UniProtKB/Swiss-Prot annotation:
InterPro entries: Herpes_U30, HSV_ITP. Residues 474-983 are annotated as: Interaction with large tegument protein. Its main location: virion. The gene is UL47. It comes from Human cytomegalovirus (strain AD169). It comes from the Viruses. The keyword Hydrolase does not apply. Plays an essential role in cytoplasmic secondary envelopment during viral egress. Interacts with the capsid via the large tegument protein/LTP and participates in its transport to the host trans-Golgi network (TGN) where secondary envelopment occurs. Modulates tegumentation and capsid accumulation at the viral assembly complex. This is Inner tegument protein. One of its GO terms (biological process) is virion assembly. Coiled coil: none annotated.
Length: 983
């Protein structure tokens, strides 16, 4: 359970009163507030008076706190714990104002510290609160669609014609209002710049910026982005995109979409696939939702039926015809194909390559430094026009993540894939940062965590993508250039003493971290940094003796005796070696279960020691504070948090080696436990989604392929015989089932079997690659633990975690191998069956009407006979010995369903009776000279075999004449009975 970040203000005041005469203890007490925070709801006017009265009158920065208590409390108060942070801030202002009204001197020196004295700080805080309240009221009213909101829109955009009321596509009229509110907020942030590092001010700005950004980014009406040149496919994809992601301002699209589909349904059939396995083609899983809505003509429909329906095609040749290239990012199926490189080498990708080049050039290769929030919102609109928002970028990033690092594709296809990854990763991190952006130190921490965490997730150990992440980092730091400069600090602290500057800088450093400038002494500053006793006859032995007595087991800092030695030239080295290194090692050897109760207080005491006795080691202090905050107040230890703690630990070890002059090996007990939590969190948040994606993307294909394999096995076990008249196929399944199937239908289904085998093999090609991506991700997680492992050889927890990760990777590898072998075996056996089927179909193809007409009966019959002879020469197909009865029964059942289901009521080919009228109709109807082999045929007369023998005996000349003439008797004549044949 994580500790409460805020301190008990009343309890802290009581501690100050009890230790008022001990300045060191007073510093320890207020440090709790400065490292943690005070809940703004606990601050009352009486509590502030008690706090000021309990502080020592001199020493350290106590004088600054007493004279500028309003600034001090705003700097260390938090409003995040309140249900309504802005209301809590307003109540805080009221209490501080009440406190000042009862102060006799008003506090502070207006001439010496014009920004930080109580009056100026409270006035600026009040003005900021008023502005933030106005802005949040506008946002709430706009989101709620109240009458006041309508009035505001009308006043800001009276000339704008809107297409509808709330829920319609009318937010284009709100853009002027958005720009006005953004300008108002940026002006307020600029005016509050001297106080932007006060925690309460930073949290309020942070909250308002995020609400404003979210509101502005939801106002994306379809009418602002559609074009007259959009194709039918463009229009369908755009309507679905804007209705799905921006429904609040595109409510009328539901009706518009329904009418559009109804009027354009004939044109839309060209870019959908009606194949039975259309939803299993590469990239098709990402088109299922929009395809279903197109199929039913309703944007509000949800696919819960489980039925099959036409899927919008992801085939490059089809997409090229019906999708505008600049709309490519609205088609997730296309992006999935390009990322997976499921592209024919002959596919025309030039248009998509040009779009990628243009996006990279316009947005990423030469980024412009963003100075205003308005610039960011304008960039969002440009990205939405391309088809990007937070959700689509997250989906595309996941697509890229599950793809292997390298594939055997053409160089051009691989280049497009790399460009897509660069675009996707850049815009994904852009939106991740955008929705948590504010010009404060709070965002600076988030930005670093986002970059660190997503570098581990998206790039990992893929060396070929390291340059992509360098570009991502450059663009994020350019688009979100948030910092507090040395010029700002000098302007705001003009007139402060050196002790006050040191306190203010240390406070800044604890909030901004290593990105902050280095403090230089001010020429005009007065006063010492801390009250040091005189140094009289202090020796190295004295320092050694005092340092040896330091014990932080009780979590309290008693450094009064050491303070006299702290400016001795040898003190930093001795103190670091005897105290800091020892405490540092012992603290990080405390188990995580005891760390909150034992380790955290000792770490806090060590922080205080370093702050007072090693004031120049600001980086050491900052790293200790970072570890304290992350291990004490952060609930979820993800990869970014673990890496931050790990880096801080090793940075501290390096600093202590430099100070003490002796090698420092950090204790990794706590790091090992944090690593275990980080790995578990990482597996849950990054590997599990990959496995779920594998199951979701491949489960359907695997089920279909299993049914297909059973069917092929059933065909191998069965025997088929063609009837004498060629109309019917008789099928025996191991002599148990007798099936009678029309030949035409039988041939059609065999062709479907061959086609499905090809499609299923194509769909399963990416399964092994997805399994490989899971194994690669586990390997990346393992690499995150390597640095700790190098310093903890033989450590039990580290060894167990490494063993578990290796075991996980090994199991995934075994699964990958088993799946690969099973698929290869199935493909070989299925391939043998399909090859046999193709040989049989080849005979029917050779004897097709088109072939007979083009090549003649003699050549076709000769070729068909040759095919039959070659086929009969092959060994009969067998199945593995020991095949289970259940498996054989399932295969036989699959074959029976395959043959019976479509044809139980199928019509037989028509029969023609051999009559004079029939022959006359055939000869005069202009029919083709060659009939279909499997088409309508004559039905012979039902005569005994003896009646059919010797019925036509004539001289050769007569036979030739009869063959060349019609067998129809002349009209009006009667049939002539033939004389019986002579023996």
């Amino acid at each position: 359970m994580m500790a409460r970040r805020t301190v008990d203000f009343k309890k802290l005041i009581e501690q100050l009163r009890a230790r008022a005469t001990d300045k060191a203890e007073a510093l320890n007490t207020v440090s709790q507030l400065e490292i943690g925070a005070v809940d703004a709801q606990d601050v009352t006017a009486s509590a502030v008076r008690a706090f000021v009265g309990a502080l020592p009158s001199s020493g350290y920065h106590f004088g600054f706190v007493r004279q500028n208590v309003v600034f001090y409390l705003l700097s260390h108060a938090t409003v995040q714990t309140a249900r309504d942070p802005l209301y809590a801030a307003e109540q805080l202002h009221e209490q501080l104002d009440r406190f000042l009204r009862h102060q006799h001197d008003g506090g502070g020196d207006e001439d010496r510290l014009p920004f930080y004295h109580n009056g100026a700080t409270l006035t600026a805080f009040q003005k900021l609160l008023q502005t933030l309240r106005e802005i949040q009221t506008v946002i709430a009213e706009q989101s709620g669609g109240t009458a006041a909101a309508a009035d505001l829109i009308a006043s800001n955009n009276a000339s704008t014609e809107r297409r509808g009321k709330k829920g319609g596509s009318s937010s284009g009229g709100q853009q002027p209002l958005v720009r006005r509110v953004i300008t108002q907020l940026e002006t307020a942030a600029t005016e509050a710049r001297p106080y932007v590092n006060c925690r309460a001010v930073a949290e309020l700005l942070d909250l308002t910026y995020q609400r404003l950004i979210y509101w502005a980014c939801t106002l994306m009406p379809y009418v602002l982005f559609r074009r007259d040149t959009d194709t039918e496919l463009d229009t369908v994809l755009l309507m679905h995109f804007f209705y799905t992601h921006y429904r609040s301002v595109n409510g009328d699209l539901a009706v518009e979409f329904q009418n559009y589909v109804k009027n354009s349904v004939r044109h839309m059939s060209s870019f959908v696939s009606s194949d039975i396995d259309g939803d299993q083609k590469p990239g098709a899983e990402h088109m299922r939702d929009v395809s279903y809505k197109l199929f039913v003509g309703n944007l509000q429909a949800r696919d819960a039926s489980g039925l099959m329906f036409p899927i919008i095609s992801t085939r490059i040749s089809t997409v090229n015809l019906y999708l505008s290239p600049e709309r490519m990012f609205f088609h997730p199926g296309l992006i999935s194909r390009l990322l997976s490189e499921e592209v024919s080498p002959r596919a025309n990708l030039d248009a998509y390559a040009r779009v990628c080049d243009r996006v990279l050039e316009d947005h990423l290769h030469t980024p412009r430094r963003v100075q205003r929030l308005l610039d960011l919102t304008q960039m969002v609109m440009r990205l939405v026009e391309l088809g990007f928002n937070h959700d689509t970028c997250a989906a595309y990033a996941q697509m890229a993540l599950i793809q292997p690092a390298s594939q055997k594709s053409s160089l051009f296809v691989s280049e497009i894939r790399e460009k897509l990854i660069q675009i996707i990763y850049n815009f994904y991190t852009f939106f991740m940062c955008l929705y948590v952006y504010s010009p404060t130190f709070l965002f600076d921490h988030r930005r670093r965590l986002i970059l660190e965490q997503h570098r581990s997730t998206l790039i990992g150990s893929k060396e070929e993508l390291q340059h992509v992440w360098s570009n991502v980092t450059l663009n994020v730091n350019t688009h979100f250039a948030v910092q507090y400069t040395e010029e700002d600090f000098e302007a705001h602290t003009k007139g402060a003493t050196e002790a006050e500057r040191e306190y203010l800088y240390r406070d800044l450093h604890s909030k901004w971290g290593v990105h902050l400038f280095t403090l230089r002494p001010s020429r005009g500053a007065a006063g010492a940094a801390s009250p040091l006793p005189p140094l009289d006859g202090v020796t190295r032995s004295d320092i050694l003796r005092e340092c040896a007595l330091v014990n932080l087991n009780e979590g309290r800092v008693n450094y009064a005796s050491l303070l006299a030695f702290s400016h001795h030239p040898e003190f930093p080295s001795i103190f670091a070696q005897l105290v800091v290194v020892t405490e540092f090692s012992e603290i990080f050897g405390i188990p995580q279960g005891l760390f909150q109760a034992v380790g955290s207080p000792r770490l806090f005491a060590l922080i205080q020691l370093c702050r007072v006795l090693l004031p120049e080691q600001v980086t050491l202090y900052q790293n200790l504070v970072s570890i304290y905050n992350l291990t004490t107040f952060v609930k979820h230890i993800d990869a970014a948090v673990f890496k931050t703690v790990r880096d801080c630990v090793f940075d501290i070890a390096t600093t202590l080696e430099h100070l003490s002059g002796v090698p420092v090996t950090p204790n990794v007990d706590l790091l090992a436990e944090l690593m275990a939590r980080s790995v578990a969190h990482n597996l849950y948040t990054t590997v599990n989604p990959l496995i779920e994606d594998v199951m979701r993307s491949s489960a359907g294909s695997l089920r279909n392929y299993l049914r297909h394999t059973r069917l092929c096995f059933g065909l191998a076990r069965g025997r088929a015989r063609l009837s004498e008249d060629g109309v019917t196929v008789y099928v025996e399944v191991q002599g148990q089932y007798g099936l009678r199937v029309p030949t035409t239908r039988f041939v059609e289904q065999l062709r479907e079997l061959v086609r499905r085998d090809r499609l299923l093999a194509e769909n399963l090609r990416g399964l092994n690659e997805r399994l490989l991506s899971v194994r690669v991700r586990v390997r990346q997680i393992s690499s995150d633990t390597e640095e700790v492992s190098r310093h903890a050889k033989g450590h039990r927890t580290v060894a167990q975690m490494s063993k578990a990760l290796k075991k996980t990777a090994s199991k995934i590898k075994v699964l990958e191998t088993r799946v690969t072998l099973a698929l290869e075996q199935a493909q070989r056996s299925n391939g043998a069956v399909v090859t046999a089927v193709q040989r049989a179909l080849a005979v029917f193809d050779v004897l097709s009407r088109e072939n007979l007409e083009r090549r003649g009966a003699q050549l076709c019959l000769t070729e068909a006979t040759s095919l039959l002879h070659r086929h009969r020469a092959l060994a009969p197909m067998t199945w593995p010995a020991g095949t289970g009865v259940a498996a054989a029964a399932e295969a036989d059942r699959a074959l029976r369903e395959f043959l019976e289901a479509p044809w139980e009521s199928a019509p037989q080919p028509p029969r023609l009776r051999m009559t004079p009228d029939t022959d006359h109709e055939e000869s005069t109807a202009g029919a083709t000279s060659v009939p279909e082999v499997l088409g309508a045929r004559y039905e012979p007369a039902h005569l005994a075999a003896s009646d059919l023998l010797n019925w036509y005996i004539v001289p050769v000349s007569q036979a030739q004449q009869d063959i060349l003439s019609s067998i129809d008797p002349p009209a009006g004549s009667t049939s002539v009975s033939l004389p019986p044949a002579s023996p």
